[in-house]
Amino acid sequence: MENLEALTEEAIELVNCANDLAALDTVRVNYLGKKGPLTALRKTLGKLSAEERPVVGAKINEAVARVQEQLNQKKAALELAAINTKLASETIDVTLEGRRNEVGGLHPVTRTLDRIERIFSNVGYKVEQGPEIEDNYHNFDALNIPAHHPARAMHDTFYVDEDRVLRTHTSPVQVRTMENQQPPIYIICPGRVYRCDSDQTHTPMFHQVEGLVVDKNVSFADLKGTIVDFLRVFFEKDDLEVRFRPSFFPFTEPSAEFDIQWASSKTGWLEVGGCGMVHPNVLRASGVDPEVYTGFAFGLGVERLAMLRYGVNDLRLFFENDLDFLKQF
């Protein structure tokens, strides 16, 4: 029995020294397995007398139970330690800054369009849209552009078929609006337009904003005031100088082009658009009596305004999809 006590203490000490589950299982097999010394002691019970057998058997069972209990406790401790180690290695440090998602920006032409629309909407203008594929009537005839006018030539205009074109301006939207609405009319018509032209300052497709006012007693002074106020707000310069030069457009009479004072220009002035009083023939073609109503119209190149506002020298940069360029905005 002295051997039993020594074996028990030895087994318990080895259990306590086990550093992992594999080492712990080795101790279990070595002491409680089929060939283990504690198991072997049970096999000697048959050699004892009937009186000794229950006493010795009880002590052996007690020793085995002590070792087994120690094994269970150690196993639970090792399993808990393994779980904690795994959790520690897989934990997420919520104090770290998260990954930032890059936020895209609006295209400079879109920014410019939005800015123009916002300025005019703030003073009561409505935004009107129209088809980009137009018939000859709305793109030319209703705007007092005669059949022999060079703008109708194929080298200036994209023809879809004999009677339909990719609109060369947004003026057809003005005609359609006058056909469907009674004055007073205060609108702007932003959109894409198309012309056979491509160089540093021209592209086959570009954006235009045209404005139209039709009401009683509208004068050229109203037109000038509208354009000057718009340009000063757009460029955020209250002292911006604007000049008007006589010009010719089939759909307006009188007609003018307007420039702004610009230091980097060779002449000190830059053209930014055209304008004029709506021609009586255009009013009549749209069902508006020119004896009762007058109106003015103007047109602005959106890319030109964007180039000036953002300091871009080549119009084509807006449409080349160069991310290094576009990320500046």
Swiss-Prot record:
CDD domains associated with the record: PheRS_alpha_core
Subcellular location: Cytoplasm
Entry GO terms, CC: cytoplasm
Classification via PROSITE patterns: AA_TRNA_LIGASE_II
Ligase found in the keyword field: yes
Residue numbers binding Mg(2+): 253
Cofactor annotation comment: Binds 2 magnesium ions per tetramer.
EC number: 6.1.1.20
InterPro entries reported in the protein's UniProt record: aa-tRNA-synth_II, aa-tRNA-synth_II/BPL/LPL, Phe-tRNA-synth_IIc_asu, Phe-tRNA_ligase_II_N, Phe_tRNA_ligase_alpha1_bac, Phenylalanyl-tRNA_Synthase, tRNA-bd_arm
Molecular function terms from GO: ATP binding; magnesium ion binding; phenylalanine-tRNA ligase activity; tRNA binding
Cofactor(s) annotated in UniProt: Mg(2+)
GO biological process terms held by the UniProt record: phenylalanyl-tRNA aminoacylation
Coiled coil location: none
Subunit structure comment from the entry: Tetramer of two alpha and two beta subunits.
NCBIfam families membership: pheS
Protein name per the record: Phenylalanine--tRNA ligase alpha subunit
Origin species: Teredinibacter turnerae (strain ATCC 39867 / T7901)
Lineage: Bacteria, Pseudomonadati, Pseudomonadota, Gammaproteobacteria, Cellvibrionales
The gene coding this protein: pheS
